[in-house]
Amino acid sequence: MDADKIVFKVNNQVVSLKPEIIVDQYEYKYPAIKDLKKPCITLGKAPDLNKAYKSVLSGMNAAKLDPDDVCSYLAAAMQFFEGTCPEDWTSYGILIARKGDRITPNSLVEIKRTDVEGNWALTGGMELTRDPTVSEHASLVGLLLSLYRLSKISGQNTGNYKTNIADRIEQIFETAPFVKIVEHHTLMTTHKMCANWSTIPNFRFLAGTYDMFFSRIEHLYSAIRVGTVVTAYEDCSGLVSFTGFIKQINLTAREAILYFFHKNFEEEIRRMFEPGQETAVPHSYFIHFRSLGLSGKSPYSSNAVGHVFNLIHFVGCYMGQVRSLNATVIAACAPHEMSVLGGYLGEEFFGKGTFERRFFRDEKELQEYEAAELTKTDVALADDGTVNSDDEDYFSGETRSPEAVYTRIMMNGGRLKRSHIRRYVSVSSNHQARPNSFAEFLNKTYSNDS
């Protein structure tokens, strides 16, 4: 008997077949660099920086920016941002810089140039006759890179959220050490003309390069990161959520995974912790792998590890976390089952802690405490099973465990308890639910059961 086949009759004829469905056609690519070569892009001929500044600023004022010219200018302007490397800097076996080296963002990557000239048109007229200062170059670089952050803000953010962000960014780049070079609201007007620029590979690459540089190098113009910070751990929302989750419940990654009671977690956990990646290495290329073009499809995104993502945010919802209530449910990854497990884990970690004395008046008190704890452990090991169950917790120190939670789920037939449902409804009904969010899912799914 083939376990994958089903048997049925059609017009009295027995049919045996294997039901097959559409599968994920994408192949997840891990970002580890194997050839010891720095990430690389190719741009047009390097421009005269003064001419390029005037052209790009003119285009910004007219809301008519040429992406190729902008990328060429951003790459050339890297020379203005020189800093000192604080420690030897290596990633995936590549030596980026030695301690004490003077480096620029260009030191992190390879930028090849062709002989193709840029347009460098003066779309908005010619206003600046003198050559720009370094502060003016820094302001223009900051405003241009901020177009990346604005284009990453989703339409789900309601009201004037994006406009307010743009206004705050403009204020940064008109305050020392920067200098005002555009009129108020220019950034938002320009953004509307290039709202999808985060999808342009070269622009994304340069945004990630600047961010990787300023995140490590102390610099007068480090505030440029305000526009590029979204490139850090981009398309890593699954891994980032898991990291936040284990800190929230105060467990190690290993301890937390023991609570993941579902077969669909197996592939996702394997995917998320693929060996050979620099997930835990500070200032690694890994942090900006998406923008630097090291992976076409991230294995760490919410879609790549959707069951893990759903579970984490159902636990977050149970604990009343606004970030989880606002997050978008991955509908294809068993949200109903994940909400059940999330209820039990939420109950396990909500309003309950593991505490012990860690600080003492003197060494004598510390030694007395340790001796008393040893005695308590010996009593627990010698327990003959007659100890009152309330005292059991006290003596064993084992107030929470994966086994206990799993047993509770099985005893309840894999269903949520009334108390879980009441908690879910309580936190979601008091929240302004966004479309397709966890708050909306919980409201629609459980409000009638409460």
Swiss-Prot record:
Keyword Lipid metabolism belongs to the record: no
Domain of life: Viruses
GO terms, molecular function: RNA binding
Phosphoserine: residues bearing it: 389
Keyword RNA-binding applies: yes
Keywords: Capsid protein, Helical capsid protein, Host cytoplasm, Phosphoprotein, Ribonucleoprotein, RNA-binding, Superantigen, Viral nucleoprotein, Virion
UniProt-annotated location(s): Virion; Host cytoplasm
Ranges that cross the membrane: none
Alphabetical list of SUPFAM superfamilies matching this protein: Rhabdovirus nucleoprotein-like (SSF140809)
Record-level GO cellular component terms: helical viral capsid; host cell cytoplasm; ribonucleoprotein complex; viral nucleocapsid
Post-translational modification summary for this protein: Phosphorylated by host CK2. Unphosphorylated protein N seems to have a better affinity for leader viral promoter encapsidation. Phosphorylation of protein N in ribonucleocapsid may stabilize the interaction with protein P, thereby playing an important role in viral transcription/replication.
Note: Displays a superantigen activity in human and mouse, activating mostly V-beta-8 subtypes of T-cell receptor.
Role, per record: Encapsidates the genome in a ratio of one protein N per nine ribonucleotides, protecting it from nucleases. If expressed without protein P it binds non-specifically RNA and therefore can bind it's own mRNA. Interaction with protein P abolishes any non-specific RNA binding, and prevents phosphorylation. The soluble N-P complex encapsidates specifically the genomic RNA, with protein N protecting the genome like a pearl necklace. The encapsidated genomic RNA is termed the nucleocapsid (NC) and serves as template for viral transcription and replication.
Subunit structure: Homomultimerizes to form the nucleocapsid. Binds to viral genomic RNA. In nucleocapsid, binds protein P and thereby positions the polymerase on the template. Protein P acts as a chaperone on free protein N to prevent it from aggregation before encapsidating genomic RNA.
Family the UniProt entry places it in: Belongs to the lyssavirus nucleocapsid protein family.
The name this protein goes by in its record: Nucleoprotein
